[in-house]
Design a protein with these regions (language model features):
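Short, Lys/Arg-enriched N-terminal segments with co-localized hydrophobic residues
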Residues: 1-5
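A short beta-loop-alpha structural element at the N-terminal edge
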Residues: 6-21
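Residues within well-ordered alpha-helical secondary structure of globular protein domains
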Residues: 22-25, 101
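Conserved GNAT-fold acetyl-CoA-binding loop/helix
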Residues: 24-47
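A short helix-loop-beta-strand connector motif used in the catalytic cores of GNAT acetyltransferases and
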Residues: 47-58, 76
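Conserved beta-hairpin
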Residues: 55-67, 72
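A short, internal acetyl-CoA/4′-phosphopantetheine-binding micro-motif in the GNAT/acyltransferase core
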Residues: 77-87
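Conserved acetyl-CoA-binding loop-helix of GNAT-fold acetyltransferases
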Residues: 88-101
Length: 102
């Protein structure tokens, strides 16, 4: 069953650490076959280079960011991540639909 969308909006600079936690946890879980240290070593590159070069939108529910999508050059999905505890609720689909309709 899908989660009720409370808000999808553009990322605020003060929320970068929040989405980076989602990125790190989701990436480690999805890529269990790659050493965790690899992702931790690339954390700063993602935070300092890739996130700033993209337009990022966050999915908020229950007062927390539950997922995000980053668009590069207005037409390329550079990232789509949903918090591991919120997966399977239609959040990723909602984020995709949001950017497709912008």
């Amino acid at each position: 069953m899908g989660e009720r969308v409370l808000e999808i909006r553009e990322l605020k600079n003060c929320e970068i650490d929040d989405i980076m936690k989602i990125w790190l946890e989701s990436t480690i879980e999805a890529h269990y076959f790659i050493k965790e240290e690899y992702w931790k070593n690339n954390y700063e590159v993602v935070r300092d280079i890739y996130i700033p070069m993209a337009k990022t939108f966050v999915y908020c529910g229950e007062g927390k960011i539950k997922g995000f999508i980053s668009i590069i050059d207005s037409n390329f999905i550079g990232a789509l991540f949903v918090h591991t505890k919120s997966q399977g609720r239609g959040i990723g689909k909602s984020l995709l639909e949001y950017v497709k309709n912008r």
